Regions:
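Terminal alpha-helical segments
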Residues: 1-137
Length: 137
């Protein structure tokens, strides 16, 4: 399926909105000590922002691991993102996966408290990379 430029921009904007909504949800569930769910929502905040960035640059991914590979290949290795920023996406994916599927795996309050500002910073960076690209077109 091929998207027009207007459709692509609308989908990118929608995914950015979903990213911020997921981040807000993470903060809300963290406030009631639902740490695994907070990790889930933090991961999906990054996932939606990263998928918006990939789409804006014409890349596609059909799996979570594919998205992480595309981010690493097209943004980390190109110097647009720092290696630790790519690693943060992988770490949050792992926390989300463990919390959702593994027995006896519990995300801690400390892990979430440390992750929230880092995720917010990366969300802002992913979105700013997209905004800079948009301003040049």
């Amino acid at each position: 399926m091929s998207l027009s430029n207007d459709d692509r921009k609308a989908l990118v904007d929608y995914r950015i909105e979903k990213a911020w909504a997921s981040f807000d949800e993470a903060q809300k569930v963290a406030s009631i000590s639902l740490w695994n769910l907070a990790a889930n929502r933090l991961y999906y905040a990054l996932y939606h922002a990263a998928s918006a960035l990939l789409l804006s640059d014409g890349y596609t991914s059909h799996t979570h691991k594919g998205l992480m590979s595309q981010i690493n290949l097209n943004y980390v290795k190109q110097g647009k993102l720092l290696p630790e920023e790519g690693k943060l996406i992988r770490q949050m994916f792992t926390k989300r996966h463990e919390g959702d599927y593994e027995d006896f795996e519990e995300t801690t309050e400390e892990e979430i408290r440390e992750a929230v500002p880092r995720v917010k910073d990366l969300l802002e960076k992913l979105i700013s990379i997209n905004a800079l690209k948009e301003s040049k077109t």
